[in-house]
Amino acid sequence: MIASCLYYLLLPAARLFRFLSDAFFTCRKNALLAKSSSPQVEGNFAMAPRGPDQEECEGLLQQWREEGWNQTLSTASEGPLADKGLAESSLALLMDNSGEQDTASEDKWSSRQLSDLRAADNLDQPFPEVLGEEPLAEDEGPLWAAVPVQTGPQYADCAVLPMGAMAAEQWEEDPAMVAWSIAPEPMPQEETSMWPFEGLEQLQPPPMEIPYHEILWREWEDFSTQPDAQGLEAGDGPQFQFTLMSYNILAQDLMQQSSELYLHCHPDILNWNYRFANLMQEFQHWDPDILCLQEVQEDHYWEQLEPSLRMMGFTCFYKRRTGCKTDGCAVCYKPTRFRLLCASPVEYFRPGLELLNRDNVGLVLLLQPLVPEGLGQVSVAPLCVANTHVLYNPRRGDVKLAQMAILLAEVDKVARLSDGSHCPIILCGDLNSVPDSPLYNFIRDGELQYNGMPAWKVSGQEDFSHQLYQRKLQAPLWPSSLGITDCCQYVTSCHPKRSERLKYGRDFLLRFRFCDLACQRPVGLVLMEGVTDTKPDRPAGWAECIFEEEISELEPVFPRTIGTIQHCLHLTSVYTHFLPQHGRPEVTTMPLGLGMTVDYIFFSAESCENENRSDHRLDRDGTLKLLGRLSLLSEEILWAANGLPNPFYSSDHLCLLASFGMEVTAP
């Protein structure tokens, strides 16, 4: 009886207790799910502090609770793989550990997205592929490939990566860099070193599979069939054509003294043996008739350059810089095309003059073109070629102007003909001045007003206007003792030659009898009674300084202009210093990664007035005609090739090459 009562009483109670227990555990599970984002859970369910990763996971979890069950149930019939994903997803909901939440959130990505995320986070564990998804095709394209920015809806929830949220908050990717990314590589490669100057982040290093000559290709610009500035066609008569190259080849000693300028270069391309072979290959390729070189190291010249150039058919003249400098300038020409008339080395150093205490030099050659015998009895005017390397110091524009005045005076003397005119002139070299600077305008326009000009502004290389103290040019720029006029001519060239032995008459000499110097007792004169003890008495009315005019006649005096220098050589530049097809300035060198033009080829041209703008001088071809030139490059193109020097160009300057024609006249 009791047992029956217990059976009927305890069985319902047990069932009720079981029901309440199940309800209790169900409520506990729901409570844990609701509190899974709280950091206050104790024990094994404790979580790390909230951050961008956890917030992203919470958003994904909430989205899954709202939409995921229906999508999961709808795919339950697709197969065992879907069931496995459902089971794993359900199990992930019960996991409150931060690492397990990351794994659960990654299950939301497709296999392609997960592979990208794994690659970004350097994770090696592969993820199972989604059923029906095609495998990724291997990229067999070039190393550097343009990849468009992904903006599709499938990436809308991928703004923050699970493992890289903090990095994404600290650094924002440049859109220009996002558009360019590296294609998948089979093997890791070292990152190419790049220059740390402004703007370079917009460029990528060139592919190593692409030869440098494809990046640094220079076009030959032919002007032989184009009209000149006045619309006149080139003459149809015979011409003596030749090419001239000007090249600063970078002395090895100077490169080693300023090694900080070439940290971007691989050591192998800075080796002299590599550079020498590259330079000789460049000379052989362009094969100029006249070669003007700067920064030629003396030992390299005599041991390697001169013998090699002589084997190529050149006759060379070299002038080393004064002092202890080891480099200099060289002018080489082919004796089959020219005959040497005279060679004049030019030294800018003048003892005792602070303005001219630098060791730069120049070379001036007068060459006679050799006309082929087939043209008969014809003649060609001589050609004057000047080559120089002017002082670099951007602050000493006064020194640069004085050096240029000495060179122009030497050119004026060498190129002057018997009738007072000048033969065709080519002046080239490294002038360490930018286009449209006062020094450049002085060479091109033939006149410069310099009085009061800051010395740094002469070359325009750098801007020192912010400095408190600035050296300013004062008139006269150089002393009269230099023997050069303000028209950049030697004084002896401006006055008729005088007899070396001067003749004076008796009356002229007697005028010095009672001058101040004659009435002074010489120092150390022995006193002898009746001989040297007499003091001369100047007659009354005798002028003390009556011979000043005579002294002025003996010493030639040239007038000095106030703050203006001039020259009459009528020079113009071969290059225009602008690339219209690129919309960028031309560049001949890149010191510290900043491109600029400092190398030039100037040649003789006839000046003519411009009817529209009388203040601007136009030039047209004269006896010497420009037939073509080798184009220069822009700063951006040289950036793409990692600057200068590089494996293709072995100097920190680009070579300049031009073709000329000279009129051939009958005698």
From Swiss-Prot:
Origin: domain of life: Eukaryota
InterPro entries assigned to the protein according to its UniProt record, in alphabetical order: CCR4/nocturin_mRNA_transcr, Endo/exonu/phosph_ase_sf, Endo/exonuclease/phosphatase
Any one GO molecular function term: catalytic activity
Keyword list, A-Z: Phosphoprotein
Residues carrying Phosphoserine: 77, 105
SUPFAM superfamilies associated with the record: DNase I-like
One annotated Gene Ontology cellular component of this protein: mitochondrial outer membrane
Pfam families, per database record: Exo_endo_phos
UniProt record similarity statement: Belongs to the CCR4/nocturin family.
Designated name of the protein: Protein angel homolog 1
